[in-house]
């Protein structure tokens, strides 16, 4: 650090300015010395920023800190004696922290540190030494093998997608009633593993399978990260999973002695659905186990008393009309009833939980990813007999595109495929831990010793023609993860359905049976093509058409009086018969436009609409003929 004694340096404690000093280096070294002696809390950190000329001392909670070995005069304070004592159990890791052998640094103080990866790299300038290079990475990134050979964004993607991968996260899934669960049928331990996995116990709860991967283009079906799958491998169970969803219902009690009831609702109940929706319910109003249900089917029949007191008061002379409050399967989902559990809540109300099971076999559009951020969706399934095969008869499980490798620089995946091949042939696990895994040349030598070419490529033959490919194909074993993003949970279409209360436009989203938004950019395309009728159809007729009568005299909305059979304008007093349209014609506009006009009125702006005669679409041909005749007359 440069000597800046002539300048006053600001001192901040947890972001608050507490004072200044003209000897920043002495202060920083003094605080670090006190921390190492145990006179200050071990998680206290101090950082001196020369550029901004300030010292930050942090003691607050919520900071990420990590342990490092302290280095003084080019030598680590951790000795062989410490390690022997640790092995014998005479001292603990906490004792090393108290002695100042190991200290915790946060992100801010790490900027002042010069950290060596290994003891061989240590110099006089180094301040700290990594306990092990693998501590650089967190849990998500540490699971990926050979991450030092990948670009940083791909490691970040791999860490994010690892959290979405399917496996068996707990051993009691058969008895659990989670709101949602998705489990892989045959998870495998990865052939190429890391030390992070051992520490985490990943092998006990793996989340993926070892795929035989070939890197080659296949008739254009694996362009843009699509993946070609071996259909026979899928039939044997590759990537198969089960999705569970739990629905629950409770018999609530209400003031006045009324309560919900589990039953098959009568036809007279308010909100009664069609008979077909209740077909799987048994006498007690609860669905039968192993029934196949789909979206909209009732799985727990339930009726409730009138929602508001006014409803009950209206029907007080008659028997109060109950309403249907049954539990239905979500729109777009289906499955078999796996389990039904009847129990009670703390208040003593009956509670029923229904678990629905759905088998998810990989299909076109399902998302898969390697541990190197190479994600893709299934683009084609091909029978095994039509896929390329090697001289030894190996057929790949998946084929990925070669264009996915160069620009993304995921060399770690190529090394994993090489290591997976060696591990499968030798029957052992390969270590792919960051900076300390098995070296590339060792894997190449092992392949040569096994009778394969050191570069991992093999001669392959076309499954359809039997002809040998002109080039050798890179083939190996990589660990692939099936992700939760399946096409079955995303596919959506709608012809008609619910609309919003305010705008009267279709609802949004798959869960609400919503429409597909026709946005500004799509609108501009139709304008550019001059497709006026299609534009009108999309933006009004199929969205929120609204018939309203407008006064042709003042241009404001008129009022319909169906009882008297009249239309009248509240502004200028124009009156007209309901079936006439000379003074107060009917106009079809988008309801959103009517809402806009109402909102303008609320801000004391009165918009007026000019109304003219229109040409009916049915009479358009006659109208054109008249124009043509008039043109002919004018020429004569």
Curated annotation (Swiss-Prot):
Q: Does the keyword Magnesium apply?
A: no
* Cofactor(s) needed for function: Zn(2+)
Cofactor note from UniProt?
Binds 1 Zn(2+) per subunit.
CDD domains from the UniProt entry: RNA_pol_B_RPB2
Molecular function in Gene Ontology = DNA binding; DNA-directed RNA polymerase activity; ribonucleoside binding; zinc ion binding
Q: What is its main location?
A: cytoplasm
The alphabetical list of record keywords is:
Cytoplasm, DNA-binding, DNA-directed RNA polymerase, Metal-binding, Nucleotidyltransferase, Transcription, Transferase, Zinc
GO annotation, cellular component aspect: cytoplasm; DNA-directed RNA polymerase complex
Positions with a binding annotation for Zn(2+): 551, 554, 569, 572
What this protein is called in its record is DNA-directed RNA polymerase subunit Rpo2C
Organism from which the protein derives:
Methanocaldococcus jannaschii (strain ATCC 43067 / DSM 2661 / JAL-1 / JCM 10045 / NBRC 100440) (Methanococcus jannaschii)
Q: What taxonomic ancestry is recorded? A: Archaea, Methanobacteriati, Methanobacteriota, Methanomada group, Methanococci
Task: List the gene name.
Answer: rpo2C
């Amino acid at each position: 650090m440069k000597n800046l004694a002539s300048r006053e340096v600001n001192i901040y404690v947890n972001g608050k300015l507490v004072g200044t000093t003209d000897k920043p280096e002495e202060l920083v070294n003094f605080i670090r010395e006190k921390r190492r002696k145990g006179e200050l809390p071990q998680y206290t950190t101090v950082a001196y920023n020369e550029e901004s000329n300030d010292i930050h001392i942090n003691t607050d909670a919520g900071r990420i800190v990590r342990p490092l070995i302290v280095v003084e005069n080019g030598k680590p304070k951790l000795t062989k004696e410490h390690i022997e004592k640790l092995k014998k159990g005479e001292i603990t890791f906490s004792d090393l922290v108290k002695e100042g052998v190991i200290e915790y640094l946060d992100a801010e103080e790490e900027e002042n540190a010069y950290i060596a990866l290994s003891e061989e790299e240590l110099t006089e300038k180094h301040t700290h030494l990594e306990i092990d290079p693998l501590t650089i990475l967190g849990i998500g990134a540490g699971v990926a093998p050979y991450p030092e050979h990948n670009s940083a964004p791909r490691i970040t993607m791999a860490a994010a997608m690892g959290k979405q991968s399917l496996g068996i996260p707990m051993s009691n899934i058969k008895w659990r009633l989670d709101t949602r669960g998705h489990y892989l049928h045959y998870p495998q331990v990865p052939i190429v593993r890391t030390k992070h996995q051992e520490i985490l116990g990943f092998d006990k709860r793996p989340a993926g399978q070892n795929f035989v991967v070939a890197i080659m283009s296949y008739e254009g079906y694996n362009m843009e990260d699509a993946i070609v799958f071996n259909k026979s491998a899928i039939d044997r169970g590759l990537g198969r999973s089960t999705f569970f969803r739990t629905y629950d219902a409770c018999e609530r009690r209400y003031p006045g002695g009324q309560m919900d009831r589990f039953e098959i609702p009568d036809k007279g109940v308010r909100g009664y659905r069609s008979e077909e929706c209740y077909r799987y319910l048994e006498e007690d109003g609860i669905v039968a186990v192993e029934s196949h249900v789909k979206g909209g089917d009732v799985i727990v029949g339930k009726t409730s008393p009138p929602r508001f007191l006014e409803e009950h008061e209206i029907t007080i002379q008659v028997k109060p009309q109950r309403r249907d409050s049954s539990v239905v399967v979500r729109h777009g989902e289906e499955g078999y009833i796996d389990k039904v559990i009847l129990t009670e809540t703390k208040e003593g109300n009956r509670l029923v939980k229904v678990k629905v099971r759905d088998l998810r076999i990989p299909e076109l559009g399902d998302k898969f990813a390697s541990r190197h951020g190479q994600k893709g969706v299934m683009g084609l399934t091909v029978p095994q007999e039509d896929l390329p095969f090697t001289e030894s008869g190996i057929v790949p499980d998946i084929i990925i595109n070669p264009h996915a490798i160069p620009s993304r620089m995921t060399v770690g995946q190529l090394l994993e495929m090489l290591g997976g091949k060696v591990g499968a042939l030798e029957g052992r696990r390969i270590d792919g831990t960051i900076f300390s895994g098995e070296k590339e040349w060792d894997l190449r030598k092992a392949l040569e010793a096994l009778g394969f070419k050191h570069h991992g490529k093999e001669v392959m033959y076309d499954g359809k023609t039997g002809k040998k490919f002109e080039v050798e194909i890179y083939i190996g074993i990589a660990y692939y993860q099936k992700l939760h993003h399946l096409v079955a949970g995303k596919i959506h279409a709608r012809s008609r359905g619910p609309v919003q209360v305010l705008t009267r436009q279709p609802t949004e989203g798959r869960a609400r049976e919503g429409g597909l938004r026709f946005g500004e950019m799509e609108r501009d395309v139709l304008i550019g093509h001059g497709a006026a009728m299609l534009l009108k159809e999309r933006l009004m007729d199929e969205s929120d058409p609204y018939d309203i009568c407008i006064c042709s005299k003042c241009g404001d909305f008129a009022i319909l009086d169906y009882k008297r059979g009249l239309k009248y304008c509240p502004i200028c007093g124009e009156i007209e018969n309901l079936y006439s349209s000379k003074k107060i014609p009917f106009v079809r506009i988008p309801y959103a436009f009517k809402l806009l006009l109402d909102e303008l009125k609320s801000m004391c702006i009165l918009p007026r609409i000019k109304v003219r005669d229109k040409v009916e679409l049915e009479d358009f041909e006659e109208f054109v003929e008249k124009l043509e005749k008039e043109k002919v007359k004018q020429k004569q």
